[in-house]
Amino acid sequence: MTVDWWTIGLQVINVSVLIWLLSRFFWRPICAVISRRQQEIAAQLAQVTDGQKQLEADRAAVKEARSSFEQERARIVQQAQQEAQSERQAILAKAQQDAAALEAGAKQSIAQEEAENQARWRSDAAALSCDIAGQLLAQTGCCRPARETLFDRLLKAIATLPDRERLSLRDGFTFATATAPSPDERQAYESALMTAVGEHPVITWAVDPALVEGFAVKTPYLTVASNWQADLVRIREGLSHAGH
């Protein structure tokens, strides 16, 4: 068998040229496309990875926000419960205070009403007692020594008046008696009154049965009394205020 080295050489050259052509105009573009595609795929994978990371971060943020919301909700509910409890306690305390105030006011009103009733009863009882005593004294009359005592007391009351009031009696006054005096008694009373006043005033005589027994010196601005009616009034006032 004969080997044609020129043919083999030409074939080798052809194959080498073909390989060079393929590598230059076919494999390189294909490799470039494959490389570019690989880069795009890697970029997309990186984007997917970043997206997954972002999604995980978003999920974590949502979870954290949800946890924060739950904590805030629990805090708000607890605060609302505390405020409701505080308001309830305040309402109960206010109601208790109002009830205590109403009770105290009612007790005070009842006590005041009882005191007023007792005072009215004492006043009515004292007035009735003094009216009965006055009627009995008016019916039984007065003995001369008692009348003289009442007149002496009148003179002492005039003597103890302030100077201005006592001197005003010199301008004249009304001398009231429970019963009409006899001429001798009238003269004695007039003489004693002039001595007590210090001059000779004009005396207007009057009979006032309401005095029960005794005397009264009266001017438009002054009254000096020494009679049972005045004594009964003082006794009645004393009895009316005895329980105060």
UniProtKB/Swiss-Prot annotation:
Annotated membrane topology: Single-pass membrane protein
One Pfam family recorded for the sequence: ATP-synt_B
Keywords associated with the record: ATP synthesis, Cell inner membrane, Cell membrane, CF(0), Hydrogen ion transport, Ion transport, Membrane, Transmembrane, Transmembrane helix, Transport
A GO CC term assigned to this protein in UniProt: proton-transporting ATP synthase complex
Parts of the chain that traverse the membrane: 2-22
Keyword Nucleotidyltransferase belongs to the record: no
Keyword Membrane applies: yes
Cellular compartment(s): Cell inner membrane
Quaternary context: F-type ATPases have 2 components, F(1) - the catalytic core - and F(0) - the membrane proton channel. F(1) has five subunits: alpha(3), beta(3), gamma(1), delta(1), epsilon(1). F(0) has three main subunits: a(1), b(2) and c(10-14). The alpha and beta chains form an alternating ring which encloses part of the gamma chain. F(1) is attached to F(0) by a central stalk formed by the gamma and epsilon chains, while a peripheral stalk is formed by the delta and b chains.
Its job: F(1)F(0) ATP synthase produces ATP from ADP in the presence of a proton or sodium gradient. F-type ATPases consist of two structural domains, F(1) containing the extramembraneous catalytic core and F(0) containing the membrane proton channel, linked together by a central stalk and a peripheral stalk. During catalysis, ATP synthesis in the catalytic domain of F(1) is coupled via a rotary mechanism of the central stalk subunits to proton translocation.
Record HAMAP family: ATP_synth_b_bprime
Protein name: ATP synthase subunit b 2
Organism, as annotated: Gluconobacter oxydans (strain 621H) (Gluconobacter suboxydans)
Organism taxonomic ancestry: Bacteria, Pseudomonadati, Pseudomonadota, Alphaproteobacteria, Acetobacterales
Gene of this entry: atpF2
